């Protein structure tokens, strides 16, 4: 169980680093891949900006929202490299959540990866609006033998 949790957290951390490093405000189309960037900044109550809630607490996420569709997946990256949040969904309707990386929250790197038996996630799609909810897992380095589970909710619109 500990190995699966470690693999899930490491995979989520790599996903966040990789996707947030690709954030730009360019929109390209070619070879079956589509990238869309929405230059939005989140503010409390902003309907068009990304909304991220972890463990019942609204996260102040700022930066671009980048959505890339390739090989049957939708890759969503929110924010910059330091505060990046990422998700990979299938492009179906409803989409299936493959992974979510929430970054470091109060000293705990949180993530979800399907098939690991750790946490859970589901998603809905309404046009270009996505809502992803679930429970992410992580390891608190102050107590590494006790896994941490936190609920999360992500709402984002790809333009």
From Swiss-Prot:
Signal peptide start-end: 1-21
Residue span of region Disordered: 24-51
Entry's Gene Ontology cellular component terms: plasma membrane
Topological category with respect to the lipid bilayer: Lipid-anchor
Any one Pfam family match given in the protein's UniProt record, by short name: Myco_19_kDa
UniProt PTM comment: Modified by Lgt on Cys-22 with an S-linked diacylglycerol with a mixture of C16, C18 and C19 fatty acids, signal peptide is removed by LspA, modifed by Lnt with an amide-linked mixture of C16 and C19 fatty acids.
Keywords assigned: Cell membrane, Lipoprotein, Membrane, Palmitate, Signal, Transport, Virulence
Locations listed in the record: Cell membrane
Residues linked to a lipid group, N-palmitoyl cysteine type: 22
InterPro entries given in the database record: LpqH (IPR008691)
Role: Might be involved in ligand transport. A host TLR2 agonist, modifies host gene expression in response to pathogen.
Family per record: Belongs to the mycobacterial 19 kDa antigen family.
Free-text note on domains in this protein's UniProt record: Forms a U-shaped beta-half-barrel with a large hydrophobic cavity.
Record protein name field: Lipoprotein LpqH
């Amino acid at each position: 169980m500990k190995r699966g949790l470690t693999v899930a957290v490491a995979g989520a951390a790599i996903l966040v680093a990789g996707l947030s490093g690709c954030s730009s405000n360019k929109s390209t189309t070619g070879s079956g891949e589509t990238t869309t960037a929405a230059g939005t900044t989140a503010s409390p109550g902003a309907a068009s900006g990304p909304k991220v809630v972890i463990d019942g607490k609204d996260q102040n996420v700022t930066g671009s929202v980048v959505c890339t569709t390739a090989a049957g997946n939708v890759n969503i990256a929110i924010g910059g490299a330091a505060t990046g949040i990422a998700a990979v969904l299938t492009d179906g309707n409803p989409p299936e959540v493959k992974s979510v990386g929430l970054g470091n929250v109060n000293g705990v790197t949180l993530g979800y990866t399907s098939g690991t038996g750790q946490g859970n996630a589901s998603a809905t799609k309404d046009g270009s609006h996505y809502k992803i909810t679930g429970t992410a897992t992580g390891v608190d380095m102050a107590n590494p033998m006790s896994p941490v589970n936190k609920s999360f909710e992500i709402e984002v619109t790809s333009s």
